From Swiss-Prot:
EC number(s) stated in the UniProt entry for this protein: 2.3.1.-
Name under which the protein is recorded: Acetyltransferase pyiB
Gene this protein is translated from: pyiB
Residues the record marks as active site: 181 (proton acceptor)
InterPro entries, per the entry: CAT-like_dom_sf (IPR023213), Plant_Fungal_Acyltransferase (IPR050317)
Organism for this UniProt entry: Pyricularia grisea (Crabgrass-specific blast fungus)
Sites where a glycan is attached: 84, 413, 467
Pathway involvement of the protein, from the record: Mycotoxin biosynthesis
Signal peptide (residue range): 1-18
PANTHER family attached to this UniProt entry: FATTY ALCOHOL:CAFFEOYL-COA ACYLTRANSFERASE, TRICHOTHECENE 3-O-ACETYLTRANSFERASE
One GO molecular-function entry: acyltransferase activity, transferring groups other than amino-acyl groups
Tree of life domain: Eukaryota
Amino acid sequence: MGFLSAGGLWASLFRARISPIVETDEVLPLTLIDNIAAARNAILSEVIRFDQVLDVVKLRDGLTELIDKRGWRKLGGRLRLRPNGSLEIHVPREFTEERPAFRFTSQAFDIAIEEHALGSQLPKLSDGPSLQPGSTSVDKFNLIPDKPEKLDDYVYSDRPILALHVTSFTNSCIVTLTWSHVVFGARGIKELIAAWSKVLHGEQNVPLLLGTHQDVLAGIGTDGDKTAPFLLDPIKIKGLGLVRIIFGLLWEIWQHPTVETRALHLPKRFVSQLRQKCMEELGAFCREDPAPFISEGDVLEAWCSRFVAQARADEKPALVTNALDIKDRLTAPWSSRGEYLQNTGCCTWTPVQPETLLRSPLGELAYVIRRSIQELATDDQLRAQLRIFRSLGHTKMLPLFGNPNSRVISFSNWTKFNLFEVTNLGPAVISTSPSTRSDASTSPIGRPVYMHCEAAGDSRMLRNCFNVTGKDWDGSYWITAHLYPEDWTKLEEYMRQTQQHISD
């Protein structure tokens, strides 16, 4: 969701903008989920740190070889507007120096990363739960020339969908992939990095890229696809209720215009103990044998949601939203012959009352989130949700459900994609000698030691928002949090209290 500034509005009204069209380009469609407004307005960057020096030429050439393969040429396309305002991809018949498959840039510092004033502040492992510098600190020295900030930067230029930027030190390397969310999301970046890794290793089993010419979801959520009613329809926020919740968000933005991003490092032992405590609480609450299942992800969402509620110091209900990948949940004509590089994310909405949010055992709150996911992640409910997506088109915002007075708390959990494991750029490592490795490295050769995903542009709308990157090689969780500047001291105290509570 974003707002057009007054200056941007006048500029758009009085400046003719032309999207460059090359008649010989191959035109590829985007999919149902690709074209919804939430995806088309986001530019994402996956920032990956390695504790070895990588050969930038091998990285560039490997990615070039991948995009030249069948189906993968989609990534070398350009985004273009159709007459009805939806988007499509125009792929050059041949990639050249003037029209490359992707944008490539690099920079190098002739010092160790620990000697760099900002590089030394990058997130690192800690014995207990800790707050670390966020993406803003990385961006200050990981400067990407002409980095896209909005959809127009693609549509009104010949910019490729994908960009690769490499920042090198004498003992470390930061690899950044930037793309428009309109083309793919979390599952897509996983498939891209996995295939890139295979190419670098010289493997012949690089998967085909499927669904480039026809949406595998084309027949789902249509009039001919009979589905059950969407469970949350009776509590859809609309009319004056929608005005109220939007006004509440705008009021919060006016009161707290600044949002900061920090990284949370939660060690394996901390998360395991927290989940065990929640399971014990849930067992006492449900009195079932065995107690209902709750995952570490459920527990982390409950824990973060409770922090937001406590930090805001009010009795507002919450609407906890969660991005949900549908690839393994929805019955669709998915083919096993290859992979799909498209958006496969739907959403769950969990209305939570203040009593549960603030005062019930944390295990009970985690179970409320788990139960909501179970109810909304069925085949029938996902089909019903895709029917809603079709009705939205490319202009309308996603619906909200629950109490109009709610505070929205958002989550995106990428743990299931195992990004630390699928990323293997080993053949591009220049040297594995101690002199070219960071002293604190815990990752295998050619594997990441840290990563996060960030969104470009105005971050004021990304508030009370958490992206769970997943587990690293120590089994620790990395979470990117978007909160207020005054929240960090409160969060450190919250972590300390939690540590004491689960250790009792």
